[in-house]
């Protein structure tokens, strides 16, 4: 005969039993995804991170773990958007996964080119301010600061903040990525415009910065002493400049940043492999690869994966990021201010 105590005990065990069954079902469902991905044999990723060394390492790690080949196509964000539009209209979709900046990804999401990725075991891993939604998972973060020539600028004279660039000593001495075109310069303009105001940029324009679009060439120009400062500087790139008389500066206000996102294209020909790659993005292996190259992971606890000289970069204060809805307006405003 069941006593009241026995009934209460059974009632307490019921939720645990249901939870265990649910977890087992999820495990079985995910095993079907993994098995399906292996049958598909490959996944095609379209990436806007042209020439970065991380993607080939991720491809190698993915195939080693799952036996699924990752085929990589790299191109500029605008070129990828047009390619995807053409594929979607024609009904001949070749790409599976998008790997692109959050601004481009947001614009594409509004165009309806992605499909929900469903449940992923690792979807809850990102830490604030990064999080996944129904279409996108964050993958890694690019942060920007300043690059300074250590032979031309004494430690006491180094700019410590974005506001310090307005000091009279830097008039005509600042090399900058073009703020009037898509890229790091536009990110810097939008974020600092939002946080420091239009007046800040009007004053910075009077400093007569020399702007161009020769990103890595600009690093060398600063190292050669042609200019003492370059902004905005991709902080992770300092790891490639170890033997040169330059250093990075993390501004006191914080760093503009852009998040790279992963998403699955509508009609992806390898849907299981696409989901598997999306989950793989958020695992320690991939996040550790990004950290090792000085890029900020979107999950916690991986600072130790980075070289000692990059750990400060991974912990840098974040100022803000871009807003896809404001992109055209901000480019127009930058053109008005920086003539």
Task: Name each model-derived stretch.
Residues 142, 170-180, 202-205, 211-212, 242-268, 281-303, ...:
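Periplasmic-binding protein-like
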Residues 103-107, 228-245:
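A ligand-binding cleft/hinge motif common to bilobed small-molecule-binding domains
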Residues 25-44, 63-64, 167-169:
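Immediate post-signal peptide segment of exported/extracytoplasmic ligand-binding proteins
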Residues 288, 305-339:
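Extracellular/periplasmic bilobal clamshell ligand-binding domains
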């Amino acid at each position: 005969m069941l006593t009241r105590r026995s009934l209460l005990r059974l009632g307490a065990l019921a939720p645990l039993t249901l939870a265990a069954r649910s977890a087992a079902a999820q495990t079985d469902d995910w095993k079907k995804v993994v098995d399906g991905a292996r049958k598909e044999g490959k996944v095609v990723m379209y990436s806007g991170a042209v020439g970065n060394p991380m993607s080939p390492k991720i491809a190698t790690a993915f195939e080693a773990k799952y036996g699924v080949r990752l085929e990589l196509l790299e191109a500029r964000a605008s070129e990828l958007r047009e390619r995807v539009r053409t594929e979607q209209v024609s009904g001949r979709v070749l790409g599976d996964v998008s790997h692109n900046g959050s601004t481009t990804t947001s614009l594409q999401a509004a165009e309806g080119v992605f499909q929900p990725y469903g449940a992923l075991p690792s979807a809850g891993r990102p830490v604030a301010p990064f999080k996944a939604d129904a279409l996108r998972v964050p993958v890694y973060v690019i942060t920007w600061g300043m690059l300074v020539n250590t032979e031309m600028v004494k430690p006491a004279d180094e700019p410590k903040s974005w506001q310090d660039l307005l000091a009279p000593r830097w008039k005509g001495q600042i090399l900058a990525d073009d703020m009037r075109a898509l890229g790091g310069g536009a990110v810097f303009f939008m974020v600092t415009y939002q946080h420091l105001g239009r007046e800040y940029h009007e004053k910075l324009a009077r400093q007569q910065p020399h702007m161009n679009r020769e990103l890595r060439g600009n690093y060398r120009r600063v190292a050669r002493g042609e200019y003492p400062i370059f902004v905005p500087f991709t902080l992770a790139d300092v790891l490639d400049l170890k033997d040169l008389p330059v250093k990075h500066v993390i501004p006191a206000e914080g760093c503009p940043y852009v998040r790279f996102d992963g998403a699955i294209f509508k009609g992806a020909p390898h849907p299981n492999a696409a989901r598997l790659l999306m989950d793989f993005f958020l695992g320690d292996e991939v996040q550790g690869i990004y950290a090792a190259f000085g890029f900020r992971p979107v999950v916690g606890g991986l600072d130790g994966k980075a070289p000692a000289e990059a750990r400060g970069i991974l912990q840098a204060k974040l100022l803000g990021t871009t807003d896809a809805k404001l992109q055209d307006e901000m480019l127009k405003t930058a053109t008005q201010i920086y003539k």
